[in-house]
Amino acid sequence: MIQIRHVQPEDRIFWFGLDKHLSQKEFDNKVSSKSGYVLLADDVPVGLLRYSLFWDSIPFCNMLYIDARYQRKGYGKKLMAHWEEEMKAQGYERLLTSTQADEEAQHFYRKLGYQDCGAL
């Protein structure tokens, strides 16, 4: 069974096992602001998503990560859909994310309907 919930303090070890870019302080901020999610498969945490507000007004997915052992099973798609629904329920009409030019993730986001909007 799949469950998606907001990140909680007890997720710290799992979170930092996947996300090497977030500071401890920012993790605590994600917990308190409810701007991070954990996906569990049969009660095992397997994926995460964190976001912030770009220009203080547009939800921006900073990180989507599914444990390599669980990739290509639809978990990333489910986690993105959950985030998109939550953001739309809060009244946001536009969502953003970003990848590097050579990342395989570009194909994933395009399949979800995301469009290229620029590069530097």
Regions found by a protein language model. Give the residues of each.
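Acetyl-CoA-dependent GNAT
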Residues: I2, H6-M63, D67, M80, ...
